[in-house]
Amino acid sequence: DLQTIYEQIFNGHVERFDKKAKECAPFIVSASIGLIDKVAAKFLPTSVRFTYFWTMREMTNLFQNMCLAKDKYYGTGDSLAKLWCHECRRVLADRLITIDETKIIDDMIGECHADHLKKQGVSADVHLNDEEHANIFTTFTAVEPDGAYRPIDDLAQLSKVLEAKLVEYNESNAMMDLVLFDD
């Protein structure tokens, strides 16, 4: 079953992690399965919403990026839960069409977090609908050169890094004129 498959994958990845982080792995898997089941039941494909076709690919994408976490930075179940919230939003909500649908996904993530992780004492402490305290992870703004998948603490700093990367790209490639926005 899916629980066994993804639990084996994720347990293998978090094997070197702190004991508390390892203990939350099965609950992250069950929360993921529960969330994707809820999303698939709520957001059915239509002719307008043809991207609302949910498969195991979403689970695979979610755990592919969860497995970018390094034990050096994710020593607690709480930090893994925060990454899980980010990945769920990225993998699932990025395919949605309206902001209202994104808010529904955020609520579903919160419910699955409460049902599967909070009961185990694991708290992500994220504000999913709060743009001021965005829960964003990336590999390219870390100070360390190891390319670690880390949370963004400062959105202004993220904006500066993205603008610098765009300038760097434009110096060696065809000009790309992008507008960065918060959504």
Stretches found by the model and what they are:
Residues 1-183:
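Alpha-helical lid/collar subdomain of P-loop NTPases
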